[in-house]
């Protein structure tokens, strides 16, 4: 590729609305341009990196036995109504009508369409397992698109869907996809972690997210530095921090706490550790034709409620936070001084595992400006329902028993789900088993955010000059920067020879023949992030040398001109092999 025949749209300044590094650098490097909120043009530099990500994904999907197809972006509403997601999906689902008033959606995912394919094409267990995948543009109408490609509305995604005869076979398909994802992100050159996750709106029984580790990540990940354990904070099991409950050592007493409605303020006033206070959270579940059931959830003062775990407890599906009027009616006091002792009306008490093992703790007195200290289970109030209802914290014991947890931030770039029969049951996707009986197909689904990978990779790989691409997805592997290409025959001949040798060796090389000043050339390619640069100048050629500098190198080195192409080609191959 010659730069004079390519489009290089670099900018000195980032747009004012760009908040994170990847957004700023993708615009400045000429990779993307905004069309509308969360919708972008992918310019030639950006598209080259996208195609490289797609190529790696496609190779590994094919290697894992998946079969590529292509489904329509526009999907009929009837399929979504069959699955039940027409009503379940929120405003993120873009719905519209055609000229005949038929309703359609722009697909955010393709479970419905692929299930329709399977129910019409797969009739026997002999046709399974099968795994279909596509690489295609999706649309989700995000309420607040931001961060460039990291949270866009339109994006490119690889989505795959497996169909198996039973759950054991699904586990095998799932493992193949999990392993393929590990290979994909390793080949791309990302620092990542697979983490146990919640299934969210997709549904199903088991899933893992693949997160690129970055300080700007939207998700908190709990991991154990001394083992392989990692899970999204919303899914990580929180073990009890006390092995057993100590015997009571204090008498229960009412304590004045004027104006102290927060656990931190109560602990400071009483001169006790925050860990001895109890945070009370009031939820409600509605009952048709009757008053709601009120729940009091008890957490240690320094812990936070995990609503996803809470929603899975018996009786708490569809819960909501109680209104202030309900709180006053059941507890006799507004929020800030609530507790399980002396409620006005019966409430259901759920204690977190750690709280269940606490002794001599402090709770609200259900009276403004008062708390109760020295409270103990059994002696002062009934034994509670015990459940894991909190988020883990750094320092908590790892659920695998192999150390303590730490917390980092991650950017989700892939997700694998064991769907089970959620969609096949709803849409009647059945097959005939070995005994001649109709059975629902057992499904898995597997997504990778192609365009999101670019943003995530940049968040891990940048410096004050620009992007520092992992070798495998750089728009070009090598750039040739000739000093005076349009003025010096020797420079031009040497540059053209290097270009031909590198291209013949299969290296993705670009020759900057634009005639720009050295400072402009260097700044452009450092901003774009090409991993290897060769500078060809008359002075160096007189000594038989060409200047080489890797994008991550602090200093340039000199290479023999007659072997420079081979040396750089070997550097590229070595980097790709890592």
From Swiss-Prot:
Pfam families: HGTP_anticodon (PF03129), tRNA-synt_2b (PF00587), tRNA_edit (PF04073)
Catalytic activity: tRNA(Pro) + L-proline + ATP = L-prolyl-tRNA(Pro) + AMP + diphosphate
GO terms assigned for molecular function: aminoacyl-tRNA deacylase activity; ATP binding; proline-tRNA ligase activity
Enzyme Commission number(s) from the entry: 6.1.1.15
GO biological process, one term: prolyl-tRNA aminoacylation
Gene Ontology cellular-component terms listed: cytosol
SUPFAM superfamilies registered for this protein in UniProt: Class II aaRS ABD-related, Class II aaRS and biotin synthetases, YbaK/ProRS associated domain
Domain of life of the source: Bacteria
Keyword Nucleotide-binding attached: yes
Role: Catalyzes the attachment of proline to tRNA(Pro) in a two-step reaction: proline is first activated by ATP to form Pro-AMP and then transferred to the acceptor end of tRNA(Pro). As ProRS can inadvertently accommodate and process non-cognate amino acids such as alanine and cysteine, to avoid such errors it has two additional distinct editing activities against alanine. One activity is designated as 'pretransfer' editing and involves the tRNA(Pro)-independent hydrolysis of activated Ala-AMP.
Protein name: Proline--tRNA ligase
């Amino acid at each position: 590729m010659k730069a004079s025949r390519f489009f290089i749209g670099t900018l000195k300044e980032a747009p004012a609305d760009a908040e994170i590094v990847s957004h700023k650098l993708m615009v400045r490097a000429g990779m993307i341009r905004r069309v509308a909120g969360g919708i972008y043009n992918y310019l030639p530099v950006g598209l080259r990196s996208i195609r490289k990500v797609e190529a790696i994904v496609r190779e590994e999907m094919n290697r894992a036995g998946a079969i590529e197809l292509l489904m329509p972006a526009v999907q009929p509403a009837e399929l979504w109504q069959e699955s039940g997601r027409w009503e379940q999906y929120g405003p993120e689902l873009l719905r519209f009508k055609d000229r005949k008033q038929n309703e359609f959606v722009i697909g955010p995912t393709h479970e419905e369409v692929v299930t329709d394919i399977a129910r019409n094409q797969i009739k026997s267990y002999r046709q399974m397992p099968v795994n279909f995948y596509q690489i295609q543009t999706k649309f989700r109408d995000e309420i607040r698109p931001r961060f460039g490609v990291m949270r866009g509305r339109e994006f490119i995604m690889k989505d795959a869907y497996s169909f198996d005869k039973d759950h054991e076979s699904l586990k095998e398909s799932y493992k193949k996809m999990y392993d393929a994802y590990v290979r994909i992100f390793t080949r791309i050159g990302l620092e990542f972690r697979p983490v146990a996750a919640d299934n969210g709106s997709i549904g199903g029984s088991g899933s893992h997210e693949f997160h690129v580790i970055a300080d700007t990540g939207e998700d908190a990940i709990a991991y154990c530095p001394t083992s392989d354990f990692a899970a999204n904070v919303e899914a990580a099991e929180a073990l009890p921090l006390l092995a057993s409950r100590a015997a009571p050592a204090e008498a229960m007493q009412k304590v004045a706490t004027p104006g102290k409605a927060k656990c931190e303020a109560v602990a400071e006033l009483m001169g006790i550790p925050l860990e001895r206070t109890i945070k009370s959270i009031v939820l409600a579940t509605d009952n048709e034709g009757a008053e709601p059931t009120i729940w009091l959830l008890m957490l240690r003062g320094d812990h936070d409620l995990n609503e996803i775990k809470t929603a899975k407890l018996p009786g708490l599906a569809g819960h909501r936070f109680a209104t202030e009027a309900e709180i006053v009616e059941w507890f006799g006091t507004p929020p800030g001084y609530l507790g399980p002792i002396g409620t006005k009306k019966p409430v259901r008490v759920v204690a977190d595992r750690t709280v269940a093992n606490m002794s001599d703790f402090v709770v609200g007195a259900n009276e403004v400006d008062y708390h109760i200290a020295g409270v103990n289970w059994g002696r002062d109030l009934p034994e509670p329902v015990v459940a894991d209802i909190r988020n883990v914290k750094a320092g908590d014991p790892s659920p695998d028993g192999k150390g303590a947890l730490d917390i980092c931030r991650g950017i989700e770039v892939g997700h694998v789900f064991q769907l089970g029969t959620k969609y096949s049951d709803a849409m009647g996707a059945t097959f005939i088993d070995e005994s001649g009986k109709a059975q629902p197909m057992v499904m898995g689904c597997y997504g990778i955010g192609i365009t999101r990978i670019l943003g995530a990779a940049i968040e891990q790989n940048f410096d004050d000059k620009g992007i520092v691409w992992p070798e495998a997805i750089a728009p070009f592997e090598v750039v040739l920067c000739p000093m005076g290409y349009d003025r010096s025959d020797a420079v031009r001949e040497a540059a053209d020879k290097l270009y031909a040798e590198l291209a013949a060796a299969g290296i993705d090389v670009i020759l900057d023949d634009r005639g720009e000043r050295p400072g402009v050339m260097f700044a452009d390619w450092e901003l774009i992030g090409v991993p290897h640069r060769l500078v060809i100048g008359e002075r160096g050629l007189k000594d038989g040398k060409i200047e080489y500098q890797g994008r991550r190198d602090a200093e340039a080195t000199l290479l023999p001109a007659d072997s420079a192409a081979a040396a750089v080609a070997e550097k590229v191959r070595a980097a790709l092999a890592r």
